[in-house]
Swiss-Prot record:
Gene name for this UniProt entry: trhO
Rhodanese domain boundaries: 128-222
Phylogenetic classification of the source organism: Bacteria, Pseudomonadati, Pseudomonadota, Gammaproteobacteria, Lysobacterales
Organism: Xylella fastidiosa (strain 9a5c)
Keyword tRNA processing: yes
Matching HAMAP family: TrhO
Active site positions, chain numbering: 182 (cysteine persulfide intermediate)
Protein name, per record: tRNA uridine(34) hydroxylase
Length: 257
């Protein structure tokens, strides 16, 4: 059996998140999907797995809602469903940053495409000859599985620790073009906005994150795999899962709790 795994997020105003959660739960259960959907007033964040027809039908239904017509979905395949359950949760944020003054609903920070970034990585500078710094917005557990070559990493265990950890390195970044990246892009939607509001106007976000980069240009300039928060553990640049049973067992325990 071939399972389709999807990841998607969209920042959009949702005035009745619980109503939407109930609708998504009903459609997802009927389709036999597994995974997690987070909904907040600021938008939606989805990690879902299922058979091809069920996945296609679910996203066709969801994207028929004008609020989600622009939803961009990333796809990969596996031989099993990497999630044990189907969960739909209403949260204060679809990605916790705890900076109430930062909202992608008010406008996105500028980004760089995967193809352009690959060219910059080859040259070691941007189109204006300015040195390039890759800034990893993920935590240390994720980074251990792989990151961009020479990337700046921060000693954080949670995304909410990003602003405090970055403060020690700001002076080192003042003369560079900084490209912030994460798994699929959602964390950088907030991190880069915060950095620019905080006076760092030389920062961009990698459109689509690491997984989008893998999908579009492969693994050039990247060392290792990309950690994902499910039973696949990590994906290589061809989006193939890693089988690390120690981590799978740990994930299974967290799913039960």
């Amino acid at each position: 059996m071939v399972i389709i795994n999807t990841a998607a997020y969209h920042f959009v105003s949702i005035t009745q998140p619980q109503t939407l959660a109930d609708q998504i739960r009903a459609h997802g259960e009927i389709a036999g999907l597994k995974g997690t959907v987070l909904i907040a007033n600021e938008g939606i964040n989805l990690f879902l797995a299922g058979e091809k027809e069920a996945i296609n039908a679910f996203y066709a239904w969801l994207c028929a809602d004008v609020r989600f017509a622009a939803l961009h979905v990333k796809y990969s395949v596996s031989a099993y469903k990497p999630f044990a359950r189907f969960k739909v949760k209403v949260r204060p944020e679809i990605i916790s940053f705890r900076r109430g003054d930062i909202s992608p609903l008010q406008g996105r920070a500028p980004g760089v495409s995967a193809h352009t970034l690959r060219d910059w990585l080859r040259r070691g500078c941007d189109d204006n000859g300015r040195r390039l710094v890759m800034l990893d917005a993920r935590n240390q557990q994720e980074i251990a599985y792989g990151t961009f070559s020479g990337a700046m990493t921060l000693p954080i265990t949670k995304f909410t620790g990003f602003p405090g950890a970055l403060a020690h390195y700001r002076d080192l970044l003042s003369d560079a073009t900084v490209v912030s990246f994460c798994t699929g892009g959602i964390r950088c939607e907030k991190a880069v906005l915060w950095m620019r509001v905080d006076g760092m106007d030389n920062v961009l976000q990698l459109e689509g994150g690491i997984l989008g980069y893998f999908e579009q240009v492969g693994g050039e300039g990247y060392d290792g795999r990309c950690f994902v928060f499910d039973k696949r553990v990590a994906l290589d640049p061809q989006l193939r899962p890693l089988n690390d049973m120690r981590v799978v067992a740990s994930f299974a325990r967290s799913e039960i709790s």
